[in-house]
Design a protein with these regions (language model features):
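Active-site loop of classical SDR/Rossmann-like NAD(P)-dependent oxidoreductases
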Residues: 210-221, 239
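A short glycine-threonine-serine/GTX helix/turn-capping micro-motif
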Residues: 98-105, 205-214
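A general structural signal for well-ordered alpha-helical segments in protein cores
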Residues: 21, 47, 111-115, 193, ...
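Predominantly a Rossmann-like dinucleotide-binding segment in NAD(P)-dependent oxidoreductases
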Residues: 44-128
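Contiguous beta-strand/loop segments that form the cofactor/metal-binding neighborhood of enzyme cores
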Residues: 113-191, 221-233
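C-terminal helix-rich "cap/oligomerization" subdomain common to oxidoreductases
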Residues: 155, 222-256
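Short polybasic amphipathic segments
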Residues: 174, 192-201
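Beta-strand-loop-alpha-helix segment that lines the small-molecule cofactor/substrate pocket
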Residues: 1-42
Length: 256
């Protein structure tokens, strides 16, 4: 890619650690080309609407959020209805450490990227000063995490509680809490159509967001336009390489 100066959209997570992400930055700075990490949810109209609502002061000053992504993919039912956990197949990338397996790398990168995006709406964030707390991990037989939780505290005192799992149906909900109310997204990551629930002053308002197209289409259209316009970075709220590096630093600490 470097020799041919290819423009790159790479599936998440872009790398397995922040050191690899930094090396990509150095290489792409040399050839002055386009690179971004693929998080399709960031380009969906619901995320743009959430950003708009927060910036307009709909829920006041941001205090905290909680964000989850988890499905029980390891429990199987027998013919008689008994539940049994599946054996981990190390040939499956999800359960292979060298192939980037585990819930943190496969799913955790979603709520991490969203947490840093939302925190940055309060004030500019310094990734090196984000404090990690309440780390919890269940490690499976192949050495990868299966059920993991973490808390983030930013310099602006904004906090985020994150949970990801291969063993529990945590769902895909995000709740963002402000001084005047809260926003709830029931399916943050994958739905084409979605709802944003605003709760404030003992009232509930539901905003329906119609995707009108495949969830990946928003991402492809935005990035294609950036490339046509010869931009070196993707349009907001897509991730720059520096944001990818910063998010991977958080994941490094979570995995450690």
């Amino acid at each position: 890619f470097k020799k041919k100066k290819k423009r790159v959209l790479v599936e998440k997570p872009a790398t397995l650690n922040s050191t690899q992400a930094l090396s990509i930055k150095n290489e792409y700075m040399e050839i002055d080309s386009f690179f971004t990490e693929a998080f399709m949810y960031l380009y969906h109209p619901k995320i743009k609407k959430v950003i708009e609502l927060i910036k307009s002061g709909e829920v006041g000053d941001l205090i905290a959020m909680e964000s989850f992504f988890g499905n029980d993919i390891l429990t199987k039912k027998s013919f008689f209805g008994y539940k049994k956990r599946k054996k981990l197949n190390i040939k499956n990338r999800l359960y292979n450490k060298e192939m980037g397996g585990g819930a943190i790398l496969d799913l955790g990168c979603y709520p991490i990227s969203f947490s840093t995006l939302i925190a940055s709406l309060n004030s500019k964030i310094n990734y090196d000063n984000i404090v990690i707390f309440n780390k919890q991990k269940e490690i499976g037989s192949t050495g990868v995490d299966l059920d993991s939780y973490v808390g983030l505290k930013f310099e602006n005192n904004f906090t985020s509680k994150i949970g990801v799992s291969f063993t529990k149906n945590l769902g895909k909900q995000t709740k963002i809490i402000g001084t005047k109310g809260e926003l709830v997204i029931h399916d943050t990551w994958t739905s084409e159509n979605s709802e944003i629930v605003i709760k404030k002053n003992n009232k509930t308002e539901i905003i329906n967001i119609i995707g009108n197209q495949n969830i990946y289409s928003h991402e492809i259209e935005t990035i294609s336009q950036c490339i046509i316009e010869k931009k070196k970075e993707v349009d907001y709220p897509g991730l720059t390489i520096d944001q990818t590096i910063g998010n991977m630093k958080i994941i490094d600490k979570w995995l450690s």
